[in-house]
């Protein structure tokens, strides 16, 4: 996924109210940008860190600049939580998930379960329906190990419950963790920050829900899914 138009460099001053951040470009005055991420962004919000912004020439937007990338531990990290679905589709189409090959149709945002929407529903005349949920990942504490979640996620736990029900109906259900950074070789569940999610992950795994993780190359030119990473489940 290319950034068009190109991104603009800046320095982060602070993030607040989840959706907003104050930033500074060169010798310009401090100004406010939108943050397309409602999560904690643990470990990514460091004052004076290098960041990159996208520009949106839209009169309906209150803030025309939007935070896209932050630099953390000398690595570029994508923080836009609206991108993982696009990246997931690229990963499927580029053959990074051969387990999902062969489906004729990929439907987006389909209703299922109890007041939920699945990110992707894969359908075929021969293959069983496959319900695919996508999660954004950008949290790292240990070297080379990406983790999810970075805070308690009741919504994420509910999604696992819904996927378990799908498997019980004789269909395929899968969770794809899209890692918007390259400095990792493995992925794991962050059990200390959300034990409930960890237990539900274990139950889903035993129930037959499929789990995959893909990392991305992040640059100021674009973000691209590049490799599968192993999922560690201790």
Curated annotation (Swiss-Prot):
GO molecular function, one term: DNA binding
Origin superkingdom: Bacteria
Pfam family, one: SfsA
Family annotation (InterPro entries): SfsA (IPR005224), SfsA_C (IPR040452), SfsA_N (IPR041465)
Gene3D superfamilies hit by this protein: 2.40.50.580, 3.40.1350.60
Protein family according to the UniProt entry: Belongs to the SfsA family.
Protein name: Sugar fermentation stimulation protein homolog
């Amino acid at each position: 996924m290319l950034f068009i138009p190109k991104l603009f460099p800046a320095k982060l001053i602070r993030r607040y109210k989840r959706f907003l951040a104050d930033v500074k470009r060169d010798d310009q005055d401090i100004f406010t940008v939108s943050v397309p991420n409602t999560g904690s962004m643990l470990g990514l919000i460091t004052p004076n860190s290098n960041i990159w912004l996208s520009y949106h020439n839209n009169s309906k937007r209150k803030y025309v600049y939007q935070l896209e990338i932050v630099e953390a531990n000398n690595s570029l990290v994508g923080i836009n939580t609206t991108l993982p679905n696009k990246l997931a589709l690229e990963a499927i189409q580029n053959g990074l998930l051969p387990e999902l090959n062969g489906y004729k149709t990929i439907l987006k945002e389909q209703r299922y379960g109890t007041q939920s929407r699945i990110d992707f529903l894969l359908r075929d005349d021969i293959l069983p329906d496959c319900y695919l949920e996508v999660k954004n990942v950008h949290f790292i504490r240990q070297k080379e190990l990406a983790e999810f979640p970075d805070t308690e996620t009741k919504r994420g736990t509910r999604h696992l419950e819904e996927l378990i029900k799908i498997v019980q109906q004789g269909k395929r259900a899968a969770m794809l963790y899209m890692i918007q950074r390259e400095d990792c070789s493995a992925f794991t569940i962050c059990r200390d920050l959300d034990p409930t999610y960890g237990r539900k992950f274990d139950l889903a795994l035993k129930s037959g829900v499929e789990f995959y993780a893909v990392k991305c190359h992040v640059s100021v030119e674009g973000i691209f899914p590049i490799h599968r990473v192993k999922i560690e489940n201790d």
